[in-house]
């Protein structure tokens, strides 16, 4: 029952950030293309917006998420303890912020694609998936905290791969231009 509630909580907390970002990806790539000469600098404003929205969303999920979750998806008889574990304010807030970290990695991936760094893009996603899956199965912790850590740390690792890769590629291009 906890797993089902957790899957529902993950789905609900990812949608408000990821669905608009999916629609925005073409615009993001276009903006990064216009600033190819300084991709990391062009990344800062949209990244700050994603983090700010994620932080505000996490706070809102922490404060009112459990109430709304129970209102929209009332627990079945005997499933109340699963809701305490997977739909608490701290869990919903953490899941929302983890989705903002995934959005940040998605945005950094768009930047990598815009500057023609397809291998960096792929490497970031492969690293994120590998880290997420590894942590999800290997952390010796209960399901909910293990899922939160895996869903947050995996995208951060992919984001770091994207950012370091694009920064190094930009420096290499600058050195060749001189």
List PLM regions with ranges.
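Short membrane-interface helical motifs at transmembrane helix boundaries
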Residues: 56-83
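Interfacial transmembrane-helix starts/ends
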Residues: 39-52, 60
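Membrane-interface junctions at transmembrane-helix termini in multi-pass inner-membrane proteins
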Residues: 31-34, 40, 97-124
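Residue-level recognition of transmembrane alpha-helices
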Residues: 7-10, 47-50, 92-95, 99, ...
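Helix-loop junctions and terminal segments of transmembrane helices
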Residues: 9, 13-37, 113-114
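Helix-terminus/linker motif at the lipid-water interface of multi-pass membrane proteins
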Residues: 1-16, 69-78
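Alpha-helical transmembrane segments of multi-pass membrane proteins
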Residues: 13, 77-108, 122-123, 130, ...
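Membrane-interface helix-loop junctions in multi-pass transport and translocation proteins
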Residues: 4, 65-66, 70, 83-89, ...
């Amino acid at each position: 029952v906890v797993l089902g509630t957790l899957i529902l909580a993950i789905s609900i907390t990812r949608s408000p950030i990821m669905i608009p970002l999916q629609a925005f990806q073409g615009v993001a790539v276009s903006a990064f293309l216009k600033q190819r000469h300084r991709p990391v600098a062009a990344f800062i404003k949209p990244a700050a917006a994603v983090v700010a929205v994620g932080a505000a969303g996490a706070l809102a999920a922490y404060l009112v998420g459990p109430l709304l979750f129970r209102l929209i998806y009332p627990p079945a008889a005997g499933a109340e303890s699963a809701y305490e574990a997977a739909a608490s304010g701290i869990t919903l807030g953490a899941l929302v912020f983890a989705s903002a970290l995934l959005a940040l990695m998605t945005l950094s991936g768009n930047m990598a694609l815009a500057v023609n760094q397809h291998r960096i893009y792929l490497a970031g996603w492969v690293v994120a998936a590998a880290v997420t899956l590894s942590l999800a199965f290997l952390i010796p912790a209960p399901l909910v905290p293990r899922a939160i850590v895996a869903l947050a740390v995996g995208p951060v690792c992919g984001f770091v791969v994207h950012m370091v890769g694009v920064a190094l590629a930009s420096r290499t291009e600058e050195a060749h231009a001189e």
